[in-house]
Amino acid sequence: MEVPGLREGVGELMNLQDYYMTADLHEPPMMHQREFGIIRKDKGMWRHLAFSNMGKLRAFLIEQRPLHVYFSAAKYTDPGNLIMAEKGRLGADLIFDIDYDALKEPSLGEAAWQIKQLDKILAGRFGLKDRTMVFSGSRGYHIHVRDNCIQSLNRNERGQIAEDVMARGIEIDAPVTCDMSRLIRLPG
């Protein structure tokens, strides 16, 4: 049914604006050191954004009404710099991604079971304490590990952890774990 006087797409944009006004957005630790990116309808990815606090991020989201919001696993001295090599990486969280549609037994229940097993491995085998588990949007779960001991790990060291986890039967998306420049969906 057509709504009189409503142009195509306007209602959707207004709903996004309302959403960002009231959404319980997750504040990434050290957000002033994180790069942000958004996907806007019909405009693709816009990266290299930086915000000093949640109020400034929320105001930007209300104005821009993006479909998706992401933040970096890495922390930088200059997260808004357009040149990656000049951002000044300070360290990077270790991110694990389990998407249910990539599993041998594809179901959200299986993804939930695997993320719980992964959390036990990270705590028990690796002794990692600063872990946050989040629903990644609609396809599965992420675990963000922020312990100081992992911040300076390089791509190969992250890959070794990913291989260890996969050898224990956990079906993670290994490239996500290895990529220190990865942008991750902002929960909320």
Language-model features: where?
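Short, well-structured alpha-helical interface segments that form or flank functional binding sites
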Residues: 113, 138, 156, 178-181
